[in-house]
Regions:
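Acidic, surface-exposed loops and disordered segments
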Residues: 1-145
């Protein structure tokens, strides 16, 4: 619950979900990229009050990344499910769907859902050759070392 935050305003709020029915409901929050959530034992919905900070999106993203790192540190797998700016269907946003499902207070925004559980497989790390060194500039944009 200690994550870097602009001006230490901490606009984020986490909704920890372990109820299987609620997790299944959340797994339907968008047509693609969320269905796997139904098999996870834990979902953490990363929300924020935008009245607290104008950079709530950035602060929530940092906090969510810390959740990923904490999960990995104790041997758990995690996966980000983007909610903000996604659609549940043609008439309802994923965010509105999650807000309704979790009965969030009015004005509370939803950034993402972090699925957490035991990974089915152990994936190898990325090879050093895949690092995108060309996306790093030194001193000025486009300048290589």
């Amino acid at each position: 619950l200690r994550s870097p935050s602009s001006r230490s305003l901490n606009p984020w709020h986490f909704v920890v979900v372990t109820d299987k029915k609620l997790i299944e409901d959340l797994s339907q929050s968008k047509p693609h990229g969320a269905a796997f959530l139904k098999n996870a034992p834990l979902a953490i919905v990363v929300c924020a009050d935008p009245q607290v900070s104008d950079v709530w999106i950035e602060d929530c993203s940092i906090a969510a990344l810390n959740l990923h790192l904490a999960a990995a540190d104790i041997g758990l797998g995690s996966c980000w499910i983007q909610i903000r700016e996604r659609q549940y269907d043609q008439s309802l946003s994923s965010e509105a769907y999650v807000q309704k499902t979790l009965e969030l207070k009015e004005g509370m925004r939803v950034e993402a859902i972090i699925a957490i559980g035991y990974p089915k497989e152990e994936k190898e790390g990325q090879p050093k050759a895949s690092l995108l060194y060309e996306r790093v500039s030194y001193e000025k944009f486009g300048q290589t070392k």
